[in-house]
UniProtKB/Swiss-Prot annotation:
This is Oil body-associated protein 1A. The gene is OBAP1A. It is found in: Lipid droplet. Pfam families: DUF1264. The keyword Nucleotide-binding does not apply. Expressed in seeds. Not detected in stems or mature leaves. Residues 1-24 are annotated as: Disordered. Disruption phenotype: Irregularly expanded oil-containing structures, 40% reduction of triacylglycerols (TAG) content in seeds and 98% decreased seed germination rate. Its main location: other. PANTHER family: OIL BODY-ASSOCIATED PROTEIN 1A, PTHR31360. It comes from the Eukaryota. The keyword Transmembrane does not apply. The lineage of its organism: Eukaryota, Viridiplantae, Streptophyta, Embryophyta, Tracheophyta. Belongs to the OBAP family.
Amino acid sequence: MEKAVHLSTKNGPKVPGEPTKTGTSMVDTAASAVQSFAPINQIHQHLCAFHFYAYDMTRQVEAHHFCGHINEDMRQCLIYDGPDANARLIGLEYIVTEKLFMTLPDDEKKLWHTHEWEVKGGFLFMPGVPEAIQRQDLEKVAKTYGKVYHFWQVDLGHQLPIGLPNIMMAVTRDGQLYPEMIKETEKQFGVSIDKERESRAYMKGPDHGIHPLANGGGKGLKLELREVDIKPVESVPRVFV
């Protein structure tokens, strides 16, 4: 199967539509002056990592996470295909501590992936942040689990978000990512995956080890759509029509 890789916004498909008009920008500016964006204002960090489709490891995407803590045990991230202002919102990820992960039903656990090798392998980093500062948080991230969905298949050149959401996974060992993808990201952000790895060798993963049901339980996962009967509101005899 031919590999599909998406590295950054600059390499992505052009979104169809007219340029934003002055009138629209003026309305946006006026609204932003009086409205609160409290949820977005909770975003406190930018993490760059790589995801692959849970049913097709040959399809790999550079994923930029903009995250905020809900509490000490959970954070939530908006995922874009680049760090630029025109980046596309392609997905979201929930990150929980091992403590919360262990409370999940077994059928749910397979939807979550580990972050241990992402962190220890040097594949997850905070662009522009000194490594010494990064390590203070990445020590915690290495022990966590994440659940991530992508809604926009930019690696296939889709100009709009088409199709079903896709469950994504993260790297768990060497040899899974394309070398050219790693090199391009290193060049773009001025980082060295090998040096990052050396400085994080002391870090530990989940205290109880990687759960055997995590990471898809070692199997591929793919969402499928099927038609079902819709339960209507009692006062409405028909649904939609």
